[in-house]
């Protein structure tokens, strides 16, 4: 099975007025997704943020849990942070995976809409099981990534609909 990587994208993101913005880092972005990544054997979790002050905040929080007081207070959280990497762009995340794996990853994302390159979860699983190329699944914040960014990816995972839709 190919390696799975995930990333949480904070730029370029749309706000509710369809303006391009950068979203702020939240605690959930760091702690909870890092722990879920370890649980589900994700190869690496990328926190993707373009603003240096926000990356510095994330670095400070991560260091607290990796080597500061938090590392002895809650060792499980320390372990979760071993798979987290802070980068300033999607392109850097892709290059990092390429450096690790020796091949460019398949890049997929999620959206509530369908696109020409929308793929089912079953088909994406086949890629992971059979193709051998690593897969980077990106998740947007705010009101989602810009259309131009979405169109640059290999695949968009099909929307998940609830009972009321």
Briefly describe each language-model feature range.
Residues 143-165:
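Structured adenosyl-cofactor binding patch, chiefly the S-adenosyl-L-methionine
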Residues 121-125:
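Charged helix-capping and loop-helix junction motifs
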Residues 48, 110, 138-140, 159:
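Generic beta-sheet signal
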Residues 112-115, 141-144:
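Short glycine-rich anion-binding loops that position phosphate/pyrophosphate groups of nucleotides
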Residues 132-138:
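Loop/turn-to-beta-strand initiation segments
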Residues 2-112:
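RNA substrate-binding interface of SAM-dependent RNA methyltransferases
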Residues 126-130, 145-146:
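Helix-rich terminal scaffold detector
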Residues 118-119, 165:
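Short, charged, surface-exposed secondary-structure boundary motifs
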């Amino acid at each position: 099975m190919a390696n799975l990587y995930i990333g949480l994208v904070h730029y370029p993101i749309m706000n509710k007025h369809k303006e391009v913005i950068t979203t702020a880092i939240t605690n959930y972005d760091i702690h909870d997704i890092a722990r879920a990544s370890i649980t589900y054997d994700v190869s690496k979790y990328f926190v993707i943020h373009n603003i240096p002050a926000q990356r510095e905040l994330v670095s400070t929080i991560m260091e607290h849990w990796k080597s500061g007081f938090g590392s002895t207070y809650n060792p499980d959280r320390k372990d979760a942070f071993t798979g987290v990497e802070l980068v300033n762009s999607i392109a850097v995340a892709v290059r990092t995976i390429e450096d690790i794996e020796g091949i460019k990853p398949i890049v997929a994302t999620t959206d509530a809409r369908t696109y020409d390159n929308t793929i089912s979860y079953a088909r994406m699983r086949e890629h992971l099981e059979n193709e051998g190329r690593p897969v980077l699944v990106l998740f947007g914040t705010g009101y989602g990534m810009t259309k131009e960014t979405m169109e640059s990816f290999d695949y968009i995972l099909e929307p998940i609909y609830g009972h009321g839709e």
